[in-house]
Amino acid sequence: GPSQPTYPGNDAPVEDLRFYYDNLQQYRLNVFRHRY
C-alpha cells in the first residue's frame, strides 16, 4: 500500500509543506478505504 509521507520539517518551504499535507490527505484516504 501507500507509504506514509515524511514530514519535511518546520523549516521547509511552504510548497513542501503543502505537498506533504496533500500527500498525507491522500494517504489517509487510501488507508481508510483499504481498511474496510
Curated annotation (Swiss-Prot):
UniProt-annotated location(s): Secreted
User: Any keyword Ion transport?
Assistant: no
Q: Does the keyword ATP-binding apply?
A: no
Q: Which UniProt keywords apply?
A: Amidation, Hormone, Secreted
Q: Which GO terms describe its molecular function?
A: hormone activity
* Assigned GO CC terms: extracellular region
Question: Do you know which PROSITE patterns this protein is assigned to?
Answer: PANCREATIC_HORMONE_1 (PS00265), PANCREATIC_HORMONE_2 (PS50276)
- Tell me the superkingdom of the source: Eukaryota
Recorded family membership? Belongs to the NPY family.
Its protein name is Pancreatic polypeptide
Native organism is Anser anser anser
